[in-house]
């Protein structure tokens, strides 16, 4: 990844040569052979499990981590890492500085309350990015055109809906009326009833039974954690010391988070390299007596490809294990399309739970998702502490205690406002746009405009809202970088390299969206093909190019410092990352203690 790799290797090799100079050759050879054997066996289920029971990292990652643990203690290596990471991450600090240019950031809560007008002024920038003025308001018009205050519809999966003004005003009123309510208490029976209604609506959408159970959560990650925690707790109750969560390698990273939080072992199953979906026969070989749950995506975040849910359901029934379908991304899209020929919900025998995000294609406010359990689910996500000295304590769900009833009310209001017919209309328009993009891409490579299907192609056979792009002749990340120069904000993928475009209702309202995207894509690929040999990566391309060979400790440290920069307005522009230090510098102390005017800081961020 970084320019310091060669310096790091030089320092490490020099120290290693000195360390091993008196070691017999046969010991070095045998040690190297052992490492090689272990590295090549990391995909073997039986060997992998022995290591994964002690660490969720793959064998490859464990070798990298071990090498890093040794290397960072060698003379000079720490200084190289510290110096180069500060240099490489300076671009992050610079981006934050530019993003926050002109903002007034306060270090403390104001002594006296501010007026509503002053408070609202702090939101002006982000509100503008969600503001849309439509030129064509006739829903029957074939034309798609709008003016955007904060962009031109070139963001992938960032904004899923544009609420009509009357819905926006309704949500304001609903929030104001319910913000202080709490579904955990029976003081607000209507809020509790609304929550029950929302769960029933969602159960019906996914063809669940009246006896099904469900939770309204804060997002897809929370829904996944709730489901996985329920299954892990059940497994431990059955006497399984090392519960295993078996997922396709394309499953969302939230499953890894769930495994780490619950102390479970995450078992990743390779997917078919041609289709991008997991093969049930292959997954079967990874199921053991320790399996707490198996998982399938409908579809996956990476390439929009859904796993064979029906076949996985049969496998789950045969092996007598729970089966979770992750429909966080596309659940409220596919629920309004005809999937009777290939169901991906509770119609499939063996499916015991589903996660689906309301805040994506359900068009609900951000921070809303559902975790649904079938009538036959062997585990439910509930928590109870009945012998607590503070009284009886029980919550629907393992994570949440008190929550705002406004979340329930706003979901209720949004679903009620749109209605099934509107959701179906939105879903069909997204599929229509995806087909149009694929059609134009096919025409592009068939017309011989200097490009072939080897230069750029859609991976697998995505059927929903995501198109994953790859190239056999170019670095796909370079292509995405060129598209970014043309205003596109796409999601980079890795292992293997690629990028995806996640289509939303917003994109369907842009006249000529597919033509503009294909035009820019063609230009981007041609530009990359004309790159001089040996062109060096930069920015996100450089980061993605190295993360696969980066120790987990270093990955987490970089992420920690990045999040620290985002949440601390002094950390984004001052001082070093402090990766190998534990206390702030005098300069940092001075910045933190400094106050300007009435506790306001006109920062350059």
UniProtKB/Swiss-Prot annotation:
Keywords: Lyase, Pyridoxal phosphate. It catalyses: sphinganine 1-phosphate = hexadecanal + phosphoethanolamine. One of its GO terms (biological process) is carboxylic acid metabolic process. GO terms for cellular component: membrane. It comes from Legionella pneumophila (strain Lens). This is Probable sphingosine-1-phosphate lyase. The modification N6-(pyridoxal phosphate)lysine is found at residue 360. It comes from the Bacteria. GO terms for molecular function: carboxy-lyase activity; pyridoxal phosphate binding; sphinganine-1-phosphate aldolase activity. Its EC number is 4.1.2.27. Its cofactor is pyridoxal 5'-phosphate. Pfam families: Pyridoxal_deC (PF00282). Cleaves phosphorylated sphingoid bases (PSBs), such as sphingosine-1-phosphate, into fatty aldehydes and phosphoethanolamine. Possibly implicated in influencing the macrophage autophagy pathway. SUPFAM superfamilies: PLP-dependent transferases (SSF53383). Belongs to the group II decarboxylase family. Sphingosine-1-phosphate lyase subfamily.
